[in-house]
Amino acid sequence: MMNSKRTFYQPITMTKKMIKNTSYEGERPLFASHHLRLEDVTIYPGESALKECSDIEAVRCEFRGKYPFWHNDGLLIENCLFREGARAAIWYSRNLRMKDTRVEAPKMFRDMDGMVLENVVLTDALECCWHCRNAELRNVQADKGDYLFMHGENMDIDGFRLNGNYSFQYCRNVVIRNAEIHSKDAFWNTEDVTVYDSVVDGEYLGWQIGRA
């Protein structure tokens, strides 16, 4: 079952440089930044605004450019909005906490290690959360979520609503509570998945599973 040594979000207690009430656009405007807090900042179309960064906090920010957070370590994202253009926003990163945030962009997370999502709405969750491990979700809603959580590992989910097919395929060590999952072809090729107090609605569930 769940790995007792799992590591979700671990805050970094360092003094941070503050950036407030401004905007950026273009290619990599904040590349390789460290110990940074953004408040009321807009990232306009461009690419990789905060690539290769660490210990970043973003509060009440809006993201419109693609790939804003790639190869990051230590992210706190709170009360933010990711527009459709901010596709594939957080990839190849570790140690993320996101709360009270709306995501309108597809393919949001990929190859993550250690992430906590609290009160998050994903309106276009297509191909989201692939190859993510050590994840905790609390009160998360995902729509248009085809292929959500492909190859996920060590996941603890409570208070979850999903509309999307082919979810949780090839997942391992997953606990789900208080969920409403509308998904055909879900839980294929999974191992050690436990679902409590939930509704799972869809055809062809759980083919070729290990322990469940």
Task: List the predicted regions and their residue ranges.
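Short glycine/acidic-rich loop motifs that flank beta-strands on beta-rich extracellular proteins
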Residues: 26-31, 46-51, 65-73, 85-92, ...
